[in-house]
């Protein structure tokens, strides 16, 4: 198994679990995936911020807005590993409720960068933006 295959085999199930939980109102699995050692950055579809303290608070806020995740899938477009750094470029397909609304589909283009810390891969950067106009509408509702 190549380094990239081993990395993806380890991280994709954890990303799936963390993002499904976040979209069901629980940020704890996503918090556990992230490095708590600066520098860390988040360029989200709704919020952009830097520093673990602000990012952790952003995850709690996001979790408070989402519920009823009925589907989450991660489509990997590219991935790589070099020493203690790795990345995944992909498309996230999510169906979840925002507030009291019925579940809605949205799609994000996502780039995630990881750093190995004490033998564990931790997220240090995530950039996500809406894939299409309908996904942009969902992102706007999230920030309302």
Place the predicted regions along the sequence by residue.
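Extended, polar beta-sheet/loop recognition surfaces of beta-rich domains
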Residues: 141-144
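Residue-level signal for tight coil/turn positions that link beta-strands
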Residues: 76, 83-85, 118
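Generic short beta-strand segments
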Residues: 90-97
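Short beta-strand edge/turn micro-motifs at domain boundaries
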Residues: 107-137
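A solvent-exposed, acidic/Ser-Thr-rich amphipathic alpha-helical stretch
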Residues: 8, 12-13, 27-81, 91, ...
């Amino acid at each position: 198994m190549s380094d990239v295959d081993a990395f993806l085999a380890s991280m994709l199930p954890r990303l799936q679990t963390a993002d499904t939980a976040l979209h069901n109102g629980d940020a704890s699995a996503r918090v556990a995936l992230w490095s708590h050692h600066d520098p860390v950055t988040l360029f989200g579809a709704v919020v952009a911020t830097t520093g673990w303290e602000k990012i952790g608070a952003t995850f709690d806020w996001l979790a408070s807005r989402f519920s009823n995740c009925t589907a989450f899938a991660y489509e990997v477009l590219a991935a790589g590993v070099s020493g203690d750094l790795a990345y995944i470029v992909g498309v996230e397909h999510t169906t979840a409720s925002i507030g009291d609304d019925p579940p809605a589909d949205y799609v994000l283009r996502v780039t995630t960068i990881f750093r190995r810390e004490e033998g564990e891969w931790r997220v240090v950067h995530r950039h996500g933006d809406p894939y299409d106009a309908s996904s942009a509408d969902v992102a706007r509702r999230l920030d309302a």
